[in-house]
């Protein structure tokens, strides 16, 4: 069985909103609802979707009252790895076995149900990621420039994901990018997530460092590519305007 976690931390400050970022309207609807609808349509898991949010759970839960949802609270925003670790207590209450965990982001409204369904059927030994490849960073693709880069070895295998703020000038030229969507083997994830370190410029526990852990074990990291529009996230007023135009 596959469980789904949606990370929903983040404020709407950069979009001139007092709302949590995932509730900022996109064509009149909170942006997270587009993703929620895709998750429901994928029919991956009849059990509640787990939303990881900070202390503003109440306002998010009010908007999502018509969905089957459980909440995990991330009291301190210490990174995406820490956010997923916060969901472990909720998952531990399950009576049925869990095989896989899919991690999605509430500010990515364009992910399709078919992609979620495909992701759920992979059954990785460690993890699978969902990259997108750009032709360049021109036009609306410039909004992807600050995303993490997929680093591959000479054999073409994924070795790690490097976040933009930690990337070298050469690594920033890479156009295979990480939207953040990941599918994990449940046991492997929670065995290894506690070993994450925050030795980076942000001093955060990056979920993306799980790729490096898998590679260090000699494990292959799987990939399922998606188109740039499907991968797009919304973090600024400019990106919100682009997303609005893509929906027209």
Report the location of each language-model feature.
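Short, structured coil segments at secondary-structure junctions
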Residues: 19, 64-67, 227
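Short alpha-helical oligomerization interface
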Residues: 18-25
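Conserved core of the sugar-phosphate nucleotidyltransferase
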Residues: 111-197, 201
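N-terminal nucleotide-binding beta1-loop-alpha1 segment
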Residues: 1-17
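Conserved beta-strand segments of alpha/beta enzyme cores
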Residues: 22, 68-70, 157, 220-222
């Amino acid at each position: 069985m596959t469980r789904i976690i949606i990370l929903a931390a983040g404020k709407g400050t950069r979009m001139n909103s007092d709302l949590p970022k995932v509730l900022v309207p996109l064509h009149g609807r909170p942006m997270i609802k587009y993703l929620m609808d895709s998750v429901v349509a994928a029919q991956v898991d009849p059990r509640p979707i787990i939303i990881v949010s900070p202390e503003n759970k109440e306002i998010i839960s009010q908007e999502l009252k018509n969905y089957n949802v459980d909440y995990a609270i991330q009291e301190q925003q210490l990174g995406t790895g820490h956010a997923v670790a916060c969901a472990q207590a909720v998952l531990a209450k399950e009576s049925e076995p869990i095989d896989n965990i899919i991690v999605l982001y509430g500010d990515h409204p364009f992910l399709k149900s078919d992609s979620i369904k495909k992701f759920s059927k992979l059954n990785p030994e460690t993890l699978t990621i969902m990259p997108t490849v750009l032709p360049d960073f021109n036009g609306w693709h410039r909004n992807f420039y600050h995303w993490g880069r997929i680093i591959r070895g000479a054999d073409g295998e994924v070795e790690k994901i490097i976040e933009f703020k930690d990337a070298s000038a050469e690594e920033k030229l890479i156009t295979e990018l990480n939207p953040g969507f990941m599918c994990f083997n449940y046991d492997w994830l929670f065995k290894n997530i506690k070993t994450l370190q925050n030795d980076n410029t942000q001093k955060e526990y990056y979920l993306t460092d799980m790729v490096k852990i898998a590679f260090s074990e000699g494990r292959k990291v799987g990939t399922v590519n998606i188109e740039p529009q499907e991968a797009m996230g919304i973090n600024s007023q400019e990106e919100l305007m682009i997303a609005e135009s893509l929906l027209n």
